[in-house]
């Protein structure tokens, strides 16, 4: 939802715009599901929103980066959502049942988002040279955020999320699963992955890669990313613009 607040102009047809709008609608629905779980734990939704726009609450690293071209739309829907679904599937066996239940719906819908992203990418890499270059340029910018996506290589027995069975997969295992599934597909399309050190070690069955800059990840998720302030400013503006709806619909907000 956050990523698409400033949508780039469509480069294919109205169908692309409709598909992207449907994806955004799904993402809004996912946010609603998660807010309901948080409310059940005792934190009001209004407080969640206040914490978000004040900068108190953190949000995922990928939402701190700008969406510049239609190439970004494809890379986000195909690769960022692919990385996300790896993490989300690790939550299907979450020890907190209400959270595990909503993840079933979220995973099902995210699988369609990946197909949408793949279609966008296929159309562009088989289109004009300019379209191909837009995809490559977007991949170049998004690769490090993708490598940051699953977090640092903390041992599973030291990860509270794993110890408490919130998730069922260690960070590095999730990253390796993503690389296993998508590096071959990226290369098959003729795209170049911007990491000369990336290679598959046949002996270990693991991917080797340039160590991501974890200091940058920490900086980004604490509100210092390329589009962090823009995202929060837009949220504040949106909150102000719809405040009258709350006053009309909710007596306690009046």
Indicate where each model-derived feature is located.
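Internal, conserved structured core segments that host functional sites
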Residues: 65-116
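A structural signal for well-ordered alpha-helices, especially hydrophobic packing surfaces
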Residues: 1, 31, 35, 114, ...
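Extended, helix-rich structural scaffolds rather than catalytic motifs
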Residues: 133-254
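Glycine- and acidic-residue-rich phosphate-binding/metal-coordinating active-site segment common to enzymes
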Residues: 94-145
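Helix-loop segments that flank and shape redox-cofactor active sites
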Residues: 1-22, 84-99
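Conserved alpha-helical segments that form or flank metal/cofactor-binding pockets of metalloenzymes
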Residues: 23-52, 118-122
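Long, hydrophobic, well-ordered secondary-structure blocks that form the structural core
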Residues: 9-30, 53, 107-112
């Amino acid at each position: 939802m956050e990523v698409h607040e400033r949508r780039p102009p469509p480069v294919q047809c109205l169908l692309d715009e409709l598909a992207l709008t449907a994806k955004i609608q799904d993402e809004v629905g996912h946010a609603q599901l998660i807010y309901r779980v948080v409310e059940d734990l005792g934190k009001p939704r209004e407080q969640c929103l206040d914490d978000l726009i004040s900068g108190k609450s953190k949000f995922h690293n990928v939402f701190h980066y700008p969406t510049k071209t239609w190439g970004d739309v494809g890379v986000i829907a195909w690769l960022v959502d692919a990385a996300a679904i790896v993490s989300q599937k690790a939550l299907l066996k979450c020890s907190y049942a209400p959270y595990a239940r909503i993840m079933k719906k979220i995973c099902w819908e995210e699988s369609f988002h990946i197909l949408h992203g793949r279609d966008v990418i296929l159309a562009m890499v088989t289109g004009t040279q300019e379209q191909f270059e837009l995809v490559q340029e977007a991949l170049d910018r998004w690769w490090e955020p993708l490598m940051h996506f699953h977090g640092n290589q903390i041992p599973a027995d030291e990860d509270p999320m794993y110890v408490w069975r919130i998730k069922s997969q260690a960070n590095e295992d999730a990253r390796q699963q993503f690389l296993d599934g998508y590096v071959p597909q990226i290369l098959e399309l003729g795209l170049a992955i911007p990491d000369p050190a990336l290679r598959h070690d046949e002996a270990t069955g693991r991917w080797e890669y340039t160590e991501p800059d974890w200091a940058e990840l920490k900086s980004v998720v604490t509100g210092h990313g390329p589009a962090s302030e823009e995202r929060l400013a837009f949220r504040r503006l949106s909150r102000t613009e719809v405040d009258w709806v709350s006053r009309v619909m909710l007596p306690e907000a009046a």
